[in-house]
Amino acid sequence: MSTFLDMLSGSQCVSLEKCGDVVVSTNDCMIALYCHFCRDLFTQLPEFLRHLQGAHSDVLHFTKEHNVYSVEELMSGEQEDAQSVGHNSSSSDSRGLAKSEDSRATEATEDNSDNSPVKSEEKGSQNEINLLAEVTNILLQTKEKEHINDKLKPENGGFKGPRKKANSESNSLRICNLKSHTIARTSRKRMSIIKNRILRVIDSDLSANHEMKPSEPNSKILITEPIQEANIPGICLETPPKPIPSSSNLSVRKSSLTEANVSLAHTNYAAKKTTPTLPKLLNCAPKPILPSQQAQVHSGSSGIHEVYHISKAASQVPKEMKSFPIEITQIDVFPPRILPETSTTSDKEEDVNAPVENNTRSLYNAQNLPKDKPKKFFKKRGELWMKNEGKITKSKVNPIIVKQVQTSNVKSSPGKTQIRSSDKTKCFASEFNSTKNRKLKMENFIALKKEDPCSIRSIRLNKMATIGNCEILKVVGLPAITDNQIEDTLLQDELETMRKKADQFSKIYRKYDSIWNYRKIVPPGKPEHISQKMFALTREVNQTMGCNLPNSAIKNIINQISVWHYNIYTKNIVLDTISETARYTLNLFSFLPVSFAYFCKCCDDIFTLNEDYIRHLVSQQARYQCTKCIKTFKYQGHYDKHMRTVHP
């Protein structure tokens, strides 16, 4: 390259001067021309040449002007010009210098054009070439834009492109605007409510203050109008008069009348001064019945006062005016009605296996009985008294059972007392009216309310221990727990068999430590687990001992054994007073702890305190209890079915 430059520099035709360097960008593979004079970068050669001629002509001394566009420059268009401007890194000072130098160059060209006519002709031809080039450039740009738009359009004309969203940021409501909007909305609602209230009050005041207009003095008033004119209130103690029919409405049959004398009295218009006597017709006091009726009619058109005298027919009934208020002349007091008998007592005697009602249940119901329903109390009281006697019989002396007695209303309504009697009502009246019987009944009622089924501990233990009567304990060989004199009634062989049964039961019961050691196991077993163990114990006892005991009977036996062992340990039962069989059973159950739990025979509940267990027994809804297996039932039908199937 250096030799080529030397050759060119040696010749006189060619003079070369180094104006810049070629710079290559490795990032985007772009080539730029670097100017040595002003240190600017240019991406295209024509721009670089124009820059040298315009800005550095004083240094380089050009002989020809470079004003001809190249093909690349014509094809590039406005995009390449914008791109070249982006790649230029000339400072504002250099651009200012370039503008000043361009202005100087233009001035120099103008001076030269004034001096030489040849240059002016060349300049005109160059301007024409520049205009043609600009026109062609504009046409090419428009064609390129249309070609690009055709490419961007899809084949199907249904697609409209992405929707242009309007700039709604300025119109959107902010939080403060939303708050003010809600405040204004609520205030408008409140103001509308207040406005409606004010309007309603005004309307009500107007309707209250509204009065009827008084009639003119010369106006003609009918008989019924004085009531409306005087503003008489709607509620009046006097009955209004009946309207008198007009002359046109009067129709008289000749057949129904015996005599018809009609007299017409013509009076002047001034005779109407007698109208103040009209309000006298409003007095509704009963008047004596006259043989004829007098009707006065005021004609509105002619102003004639007409009076008709009509005689009564034979078939007509005289009508009397009703007076108010009604006068009561006589009050008849009727005797109280005697109601028929509601029900009678049954004549059947109780069977031996009849259900025994739970005493604790009846006592608890009597204690918590409401005051307004003494009906159930007296009924249950009578049933308990009769069942304790063992049978129900008719009594000639006292055959009556009171069904409902209210002490507060005995004097006021004695006739409303409902009774159930098998004898005549005279016997009931003589006994019910006696103060002695009523006093005894009230004393029994007060004593029964004061009685507490859980007050005395020994009574509770005795009740619980005597539920099964010894018959269930005989099945497992443990009757000595409740009866100390059982040895005197049994033979030696029977005693030995009873001890064997007790030994078998104690061995089986020893296996189920989760039942008899419930309070010492930590954590205690769940009721579901204990109930499963209880069913397993019942099944094993029935299989080994050849009996048919229910689950409730096994629970009853366990409770009695635990209470008996606890009483001996706490010295409530002296060892010297018990029999040898009881001592033998005590040795069999020596593994039992002092603390034990109560198992309810009706459900799966377990209690550690005696008071809670007794309270639970009282609250049980089972009223009927079998005397053989101590199983309880809520309804008598279930009890009867049990007796037919289990104890035939």
UniProtKB/Swiss-Prot annotation:
Annotated Polar residues bias: 85-94
Keyword Hydrolase attributed: no
Subcellular location, record wording: Nucleus; Chromosome
GO CC terms, sorted: autosome; nucleus
Biased composition (Basic and acidic residues): 96-107
Stretches the record annotates as Disordered: 76-127, 146-170
Role noted for this protein: Specifically required in males for proper segregation of autosomal bivalents at meiosis I. Expression is required in the male germ line prior to spermatocyte stage S4. May have a role as a bridging molecule maintaining adhesion to hold autosome bivalents together via heterochromatic connections.
Protein's UniProt name: Protein teflon
Taxonomic source organism: Drosophila yakuba (Fruit fly)
Lineage summary: Eukaryota, Metazoa, Ecdysozoa, Arthropoda, Hexapoda
Gene (UniProt): tef
